[in-house]
């Protein structure tokens, strides 16, 4: 996203609850903030910002069909997409369970306003169904049990990632492998 999109096109907010290696993106002009465990005030403020942005965009888009694509097409104006990254969702939820309802709301309603979430998890059951159902696209890296692929993606027609590090699969019209 940082390589192919300007800060006028996308704004990233990154919460890293794993190795904190995503701090490397902190200086990118598209990144508003990189937050880690213990950044309580920053995380609370992010959810306030997202709520305000959602309210503002709801009003702004109302005269143009109510969604970001219609607004851009009909008004001729551009507005940046907002992408929130949560690396290691289970650790995030363990520390900030009070924000779970916010996550459910933003992942369900946010896409029409240009607010998107990218969430990582170590185990297939780290993300509760109430949240998981709000994601249209999932990418799965190596899992221990082949039945876990179907638990996440549905029927994978016997397609599993090669046993090379970094390989995974995702499902669109069919199942694809990626590196």
Regions from the PLM with identified roles:
Residues 95, 99-101, 165-179:
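Conserved P-loop NTPase motor module
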Residues 154-168:
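P-loop/Walker A phosphate-binding loop and immediately adjacent motor/lid segment at beta-alpha junctions
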Residues 68-69, 169:
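Polar low-complexity intrinsically disordered regions enriched in Ser/Thr and small residues
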Residues 1-67, 73-147, 151, 159-160:
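P-loop NTPase catalytic phosphate-binding loop
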